[in-house]
Amino acid sequence: FLNGRQALGVKSATPGHEPVVEISSIDQLYPPAGGVLHLWRFVFTPNANGTLSVPELAGTLRAALDDCTGLDERLGALGYDPAAPEAWNSHRFTLTQRDLYLVGPGFPRLDRNAVIPLPDGVSHLRFRVDLALAAAMRLGSRAEEEAALRHFLEDA
């Protein structure tokens, strides 16, 4: 997500996976020019009594949006129909972990200057980052998380 000079990457996982995130492009771990990039990793545990479900999250998002067309198109592409949410209610989750990282010098990532331009015949580059090696970049307190999110939302 991009808001002015603030960027926020979001990754999700289920329990049992090491703290590794998949990065879909070389530029995904670079902030906008003169800006800041945070990476938020969420771990969701399947739980029949969990507080999170697609219909509830979709409803929350729809209530916050003036125009739901884009959201409905994206959810529809995944097979979700807001008129018939019952099939999705059985998939419930509990948020069991969240970690926010400041991505910058010292964060494990590929150096874009080392691989750009890509060689002829190579059009995409995906890689994984072990967040255990980014522990020093992790924002540890709820106050730090809230400040980073507030800064992201307020920058334009």
Regions found by a protein language model. Name each.
Residues 2, 14-156:
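Nucleic-acid endonuclease domains
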Residues 3-7:
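Active-site beta-strand-loop-beta-strand hairpin of nuclease catalytic cores
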Residues 8-12:
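Hydrophobic/aromatic-rich core segments of domains that either
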